[in-house]
Amino acid sequence: MSGSSRRLLWAATCLAVLCVSAAQPNITTLAPNVTEVPTTTTKVVPTTQMPTVLPETCASFNSCVSCVNATFTNNITCFWLHCQEANKTYCANEPLSNCSQVNRTDLCSVIPPTTPVPTNSTAKPTTRPSSPTPTPSVVTSAGTTNTTLTPTSQPERKSTFDAASFIGGIVLVLGVQAVIFFLYKFCKSKERNYHTL
């Protein structure tokens, strides 16, 4: 075997290893944060929470304390509203006439809203793994009331077999091997000695 054939064989082997390693599924995927939202029945439907970026509007605040404190920290005026007719509590830029408003943190209640907030999530429902309950942490800041926050644990994601990816990986590897084979044959044909008559 000549020097160029060895290099070509070595390059083909490295390319095949690279293709096989790239075709393997990514095992270290992170599961999204999942919280359970109670419905009118006893069935629990999990929803995916998106990570929050720095809030710029009042609608992005989901608690009374963060809504009222936005006036001081983000230089925007927000009101925490309790609407009895719609049975909703939320943060808004301006008060509504049929809702009572809260503009001080000492008036904020720790009771969560009774109606679940609808989301536009397309995530499949996942089951929470059996794990010990995390200990709640108490967050306290000057001039506010104590609120107990329970951290949500991330459920493990079950990996499933994806037939389309498997077939695509096989086609990719066979295609790369065919290209390598024809390149090898082409280079081998160039190495022959041609004799003139």
UniProtKB/Swiss-Prot annotation:
Residues 184-197 are cytoplasmic. The lineage of its organism: Eukaryota, Metazoa, Chordata, Craniata, Vertebrata. GO terms for biological process: cell adhesion; heterophilic cell-cell adhesion via plasma membrane cell adhesion molecules; muscle organ development. Belongs to the CD164 family. The keyword Transmembrane applies. Sialomucin that may play a key role in hematopoiesis. May be involved in cell adhesion. Promotes myogenesis by enhancing CXCR4-dependent cell motility. Positively regulates myoblast migration and promotes myoblast fusion into myotubes. Residues 1-23 form the signal peptide. GO terms for cellular component: endosome; endosome membrane; lysosomal membrane; plasma membrane. Glycans are attached at N26, N33, N69, N75, N87, N98, N103, N120, N146. Interacts with CXCR4. This is Sialomucin core protein 24. The chain crosses the membrane at residues 163-183. It comes from Mus musculus (Mouse). Residues 191-197 are annotated as: Required for endosomal and lysosomal localization.
